[in-house]
Amino acid sequence: IIDCTASQLVDFAHLGSKFMKQLYKIEAPKVGLLSNGSEPTKGNKVVKETHQLLKEDETINFIGNIEAVETWSGLCDVLVADGFAGNQILKNTQGVAMTLIKEIMKYGVMTNQEDVTKQIAGHIMKNYDFESNGAAIMLGAKKYVLKCRGSSGPKATVSACNMLINLINNKTVFEE
């Protein structure tokens, strides 16, 4: 959802928390809210309202606002964002990862360190390549719904199918 209400963002926090509890066995997942500053007064009207609602919700382990620069810091287990901001974070991360890989490979060629740089680039690709990670699980549906990127190729499709098989085999349920 691109234009979310505060209530919908709180629902996302609940869904994300349940997902992390069930799939990753994190007892009290730390939930952050994507904002343009860590202070509760930062963000647009919806973000400020969501911050207050999450702060008051005793069933959520809310740790506060998270800035984009902290997205991958490990501060939170669940990062709540609307569809527009979340998509921008993901695509920016992929772009930065691909740029870093190119720079690392260029450095390896220039310094005759190609073996080492290939290992580093491979590690980055494994963690940030959408083709390897296949799909995103759409939470809140009664059945499994996985969403692949529009530009996904065969590798991403196979990865998504393997993800679905794993969910089914482990009898993963995302509802109470």
What does each model-identified segment do?
Residues 1-4, 57-81, 85, 172-176:
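Unusually extended, aromatic-enriched hydrophobic runs near protein termini
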Residues 28, 33, 39, 60, ...:
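Short glycine- and Lys/Arg-enriched binding-loop motifs that mark or flank ligand-binding interfaces
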Residues 75-79, 83-176:
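Glycine-rich phosphate/nucleotide-binding loop
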Residues 1-2, 35-40, 66-70, 82-86, ...:
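Glycine-rich beta-alpha junction loops
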Residues 3-68:
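Glycine-rich phosphate/diphosphate-binding loop of Rossmann-like nucleotide-binding domains
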Residues 7, 17, 35-38, 73, ...:
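Generic serine detector
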